[in-house]
């Protein structure tokens, strides 16, 4: 059993190892340059420069140098691994902004077109205003005529009321005068009838009228 476990661990270890060619290719890809020759030149120049600086004591390797180297390697790895993701995110963000700007532009264009359509509908506003003004003038004229007619009707009603009152007054005055005249005549007749001379005169006149009737017969 221990040997089987050791064999399994060894097989897993070898299966997880990266191919040296692939690793070398990834290192070359991380070095700036357009082709393999230029990248190799950059790498060789960097190595020779480092050896020269260290051998001539122009640069002394210390803890800070190690930390700086590790940090630089970390930055290179992060840039290598995170570069595509950041590029994809940046492309997506730019595309999103482009879509937002295009949508805003389309909305603004539609709003401008709608405004132009509304204005084009009002191209006959002058004629419409003139027609409305003419109608309003006719309406004012009709209202003035109606008001004048109403005033005339009111005046006629008031005049009729005054005339009716005057006629009623005259009728009442005439009736009083006739009543007074009748009462005066009746009173005079009654007074005359009570007078003996008047009675004698009436009797004599009546006898004469009868005699005339007999004479004609």
Swiss-Prot record:
GO CC, any one term: proton-transporting ATP synthase complex
Membrane topology designation: Multi-pass membrane protein
Localization, UniProt: Mitochondrion inner membrane
MF annotations from Gene Ontology: proton-transporting ATP synthase activity, rotational mechanism; proton-transporting ATPase activity, rotational mechanism
Disulfide bonds: none
Superkingdom, taxonomy of origin: Eukaryota
TM regions (residue ranges): 41-61, 66-86
InterPro entries hit by this protein: ATP_synth_Bsub_B/MI25, ATP_synth_F0_suB
Keyword Nuclease: no
Reported function: Mitochondrial membrane ATP synthase (F(1)F(0) ATP synthase or Complex V) produces ATP from ADP in the presence of a proton gradient across the membrane which is generated by electron transport complexes of the respiratory chain. F-type ATP synthases consist of two structural domains, F(1) - containing the extramembraneous catalytic core, and F(0) - containing the membrane proton channel, linked together by a central stalk and a peripheral stalk.
Protein name from the UniProt record: ATP synthase subunit 4, mitochondrial
GO biological process entries: protein-containing complex assembly; proton motive force-driven ATP synthesis
Keyword check for Mitochondrion: yes
SUBUNIT field: F-type ATP synthases have 2 components, the catalytic core F(1) and the membrane-embedded component F(0), linked together by a central stalk and a peripheral stalk. The central stalk, also called rotor shaft, is often seen as part of F(1). The peripheral stalk is seen as part of F(0). F(0) contains the membrane channel next to the rotor. F-type ATP synthases form dimers but each monomer functions independently in ATP generation.
Gene that this polypeptide is encoded by: ATP4
Family: Belongs to the eukaryotic ATPase B chain family.
Keywords: ATP synthesis, CF(0), Hydrogen ion transport, Ion transport, Membrane, Mitochondrion, Mitochondrion inner membrane, Transit peptide, Transmembrane, Transmembrane helix, Transport
Residue span of the annotated presequence: 1-14
